Swiss-Prot record:
GO cellular component: cytosol
Protein family per UniProt: Belongs to the bacterial histone-like protein family.
Pfam families, alphabetized: Bac_DNA_binding (PF00216)
Organism taxonomic ancestry: Bacteria, Pseudomonadati, Pseudomonadota, Alphaproteobacteria, Hyphomicrobiales
InterPro entries: Hist_DNA-bd (IPR000119), Histone-like_DNA-bd_CS (IPR020816), IHF-like_DNA-bd_dom_sf (IPR010992), IHF_alpha (IPR005684)
Gene Ontology biological process terms, A to Z: DNA recombination; positive regulation of metabolic process; regulation of DNA-templated transcription; regulation of translation
Role this protein plays: This protein is one of the two subunits of integration host factor, a specific DNA-binding protein that functions in genetic recombination as well as in transcriptional and translational control.
UniProt keyword list: DNA recombination, DNA-binding, Transcription, Transcription regulation, Translation regulation
This protein's name: Integration host factor subunit alpha
NCBIfam families, sorted: PRK00285.1 (NF001401)
Subunit structure: Heterodimer of an alpha and a beta chain.
Gene Ontology MF term list: DNA binding; structural constituent of chromatin
Amino acid sequence: MAGKTVTRADLSEAVYQQVGLSRAESAALVETVLGEICNCLSSGETVKLSSFGSFVVRSKGKRIGRNPKTGVEVEIEPRQVMVFKPSNVLKARINGGHVNGLDADEDE
């Protein structure tokens, strides 16, 4: 599946195929899960998905940056950024390896 971008529609179709919900129910389920993740992140909570990874909101302080074209210094305001940290299980699965004696293919 290298090179392909997975969309919400693809996720909904996978739920439809594997779980047996209707297409409308599958789409609603995907939207609900993604919406809840967004709500948690926007309120500053960390989202941890076992065997997948963690989404964390981090604060970045004010700093001085440079316009790469002109070299002029610009003040960059403080902001929140979202960071994804993959689990060791996901890293191993991507790299085709093993983690803690488990095959990367095994579902937990």
